[in-house]
């Protein structure tokens, strides 16, 4: 999905029904939000969390959308926003002692990442 306005072009990618809780995905997204595409990929590669694999897939999809649909250069892209919302919960039951059953909640989430090109710095901004 792409969205264009007068000043900036934004490319968005969504990953729906990803297994894992939204709170665990958010702690990774908080670290890469506002970073460049290259820096975010390096960070995701070395983070010790299970949720980095689906986040990497969604990030690569957003960059591919920007490159193919909007003709943007991947080296100039930054992650403008990234969020995770909770999805449906799969309920399973585990047998326990004396005929009891404990419920197991297998959570899912929806991941969304949007990228845009970094603002060009003028000579005056670079010197300051």
From Swiss-Prot:
InterPro entries membership: Ribosomal_uL22 (IPR001063), Ribosomal_uL22_bac/chlpt-type (IPR005727), Ribosomal_uL22_bac/org-type (IPR047867), Ribosomal_uL22_CS (IPR018260), Ribosomal_uL22_sf (IPR036394)
Source species, please? Prochlorococcus marinus (strain MIT 9215)
Record text on subunit structure and interactions: Part of the 50S ribosomal subunit.
Looking up SUPFAM superfamilies in the UniProt record yields: Ribosomal protein L22
Functional description taken from the UniProt entry: This protein binds specifically to 23S rRNA; its binding is stimulated by other ribosomal proteins, e.g. L4, L17, and L20. It is important during the early stages of 50S assembly. It makes multiple contacts with different domains of the 23S rRNA in the assembled 50S subunit and ribosome. The globular domain of the protein is located near the polypeptide exit tunnel on the outside of the subunit, while an extended beta-hairpin is found that lines the wall of the exit tunnel in the center of the 70S ribosome.
Provide this UniProt record's keywords sorted from A to Z. Ribonucleoprotein, Ribosomal protein, RNA-binding, rRNA-binding
Similarity-based family? Belongs to the universal ribosomal protein uL22 family.
The reply on keyword Ribonucleoprotein is yes
| CDD domains reported for this sequence | Ribosomal_L22
Q: Name one GO cellular component term.
A: cytosolic large ribosomal subunit
Which GO molecular-function terms appear in the entry?
Answer: rRNA binding; structural constituent of ribosome
Q: Which GO terms describe its biological process?
A: translation
- Official protein name in the record: Large ribosomal subunit protein uL22
């Amino acid at each position: 999905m792409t969205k264009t306005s007068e000043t900036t072009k934004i490319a968005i990618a969504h990953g729906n029904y990803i297994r894992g809780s939204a709170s665990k995905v958010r702690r990774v997204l908080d670290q890469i939000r506002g970073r460049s595409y290259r820096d975010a990929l390096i960070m995701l590669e070395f983070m010790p969390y299970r949720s980095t694999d689906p986040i990497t897939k969604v990030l690569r999809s957003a960059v591919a959308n920007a490159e193919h649909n909007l003709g943007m250069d991947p080296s100039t892209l930054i992650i403008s926003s990234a969020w995770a919302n909770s999805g449906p919960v799969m309920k399973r039951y585990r047998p326990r002692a004396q005929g009891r059953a404990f419920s197991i909640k297998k959570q899912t989430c929806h991941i969304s990442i949007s990228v845009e090109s970094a603002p060009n710095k003028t000579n005056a901004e670079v010197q300051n």
